[in-house]
């Protein structure tokens, strides 16, 4: 399920009835806004290699974009899989290069029509759950966006609305499950940076529940003028992860770091800017954290009611952002038989020996 408005009871029952009759799992993330039976937030599981053991025969997609790069990488590499798209617009959106059928209808209509009366086993869902329960999210992480997500995901008040100025924030927070009453949104079509603060503030006008956004320094400063909007409500909460300029670009291009020095192409790299002056001038309560101790002191204020909107600026280092992501993936890595054989060869031959073997095989 991609980005979707919260499902009503009719939609949820149709999906659950469909699931009862087929051996399926409903893969969701925070943007899906679905928490029905047979659903699983499997982002961390897939990022750790879980799809090697969970190969689907048919993929049915509903909703908009997912912003889920681990899922895209895993599914795009599968050869013997059908992709069915269910959408009222009937558009040919072949995200995973496996599109075979398009059902031009509402998702409720599709699931309701295909829901039968013959119940079946659910071994596929049980396999997902078995692997999911093996994951360890409670590992020691360096101070980073991922650390903030790890410390806050159980603390966000029920019925809150959480926004993600993707890509880094969406990935980090998708590793951790939130309370089912919490709604999630992101500007995925604009890849997060366009108007994320403005969206949050507009959204907060329609509710009295706490409205959060987890954003990076580049996305925040790109839309900083939104903080100057008059009459911003006191339910606004901004968590600004300031890593000094474009950590996500460096994480995503790590495999090329020897050939391309990405920092040379990030105009805001090393900007040394802070939101403090602007936030306070716009009437926000401002807190900052530079380490675990100072973050712990600010955390309670962030998730509590207040008389003014709040911004928490968390100063991190680019290296820690990458280390944190590498750590949580390495700690939960799911290996196939092929991976184990490759690891054995590498241990025996070493890096140089493995490179020589690759050249021999290629030639």
Q: Can you describe what each PLM-predicted range is?
A:
Residues 76-168, 292-363:
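Phosphate/pyrophosphate-binding active-site segments
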Residues 2-84, 179-207, 221-224, 290-293:
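Glycine-rich, anion-gripping cofactor-binding loops and their flanking helix/strand elements
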Residues 27-129, 230-231, 238, 244, ...:
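Glycine-rich, acidic loop regions that bind phosphate or pyrophosphate groups
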Residues 175-363:
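Thiamine diphosphate
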Residues 17, 73, 113, 150-155, ...:
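Alpha-helical scaffold segments in soluble metabolic enzymes
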Residues 36, 131, 171-174, 247-250:
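Short acidic/His/Gly/Ser-rich catalytic and metal-binding motifs that mark active-site loops
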Residues 3-6, 31-32, 63-67, 89, ...:
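Short glycine-rich anion-binding loops that position phosphate/pyrophosphate groups of nucleotides
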Residues 58, 161, 210-212:
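Structural motif
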